[in-house]
């Protein structure tokens, strides 16, 4: 499965906007392709410390994840990042969020 930057951003925003701060994805025997893809991307995000699994199939943002979503949720900034080369995207991020979030996002998105 390929990494999907849009899906990662959408999941971060979805987590931040959730009333309970937790989304339930995965862990179902008959999961849809969408659920399997979301769970895969959440695990990639967990690898970089942006989210943690709270209980069976529940996911929440970490402090670094909140920093990341603050930067990536601004649509104009996101569009700028997507059109930038890896080095330029990394430099743009450095001015927009914490150093831990920059490192996590850059590695996850392939920009650093």
Locate the predicted segments by residue.
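Short, amphipathic alpha-helical interaction segments positioned at domain boundaries
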Residues: 63-88
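Short, mixed-charge amphipathic alpha-helical segments
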Residues: 30-34, 51
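Leucine-rich, amphipathic alpha-helical/linker segments
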Residues: 81-112
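Short amphipathic alpha-helical interface segments
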Residues: 2-31
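A short, conserved structural fragment
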Residues: 43-56
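Short alpha-helix boundary/capping elements
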Residues: 16-20, 50, 73
């Amino acid at each position: 499965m390929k990494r999907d930057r849009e899906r990662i951003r959408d999941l971060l925003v979805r987590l931040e906007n959730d009333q309970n701060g937790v989304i339930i994805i995965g862990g179902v025997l008959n999961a849809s392709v969408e659920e399997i893809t979301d769970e895969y991307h959440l695990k990639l995000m967990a690898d970089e410390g942006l989210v943690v699994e709270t209980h069976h199939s529940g996911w929440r943002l970490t402090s670094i994840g909140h920093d990341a979503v603050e930067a990536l949720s601004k649509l104009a900034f996101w569009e700028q990042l997507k059109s930038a080369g890896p080095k330029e995207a990394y430099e743009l991020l450095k001015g927009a969020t914490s150093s831990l979030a920059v490192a996590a996002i850059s590695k996850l998105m392939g920009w650093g």
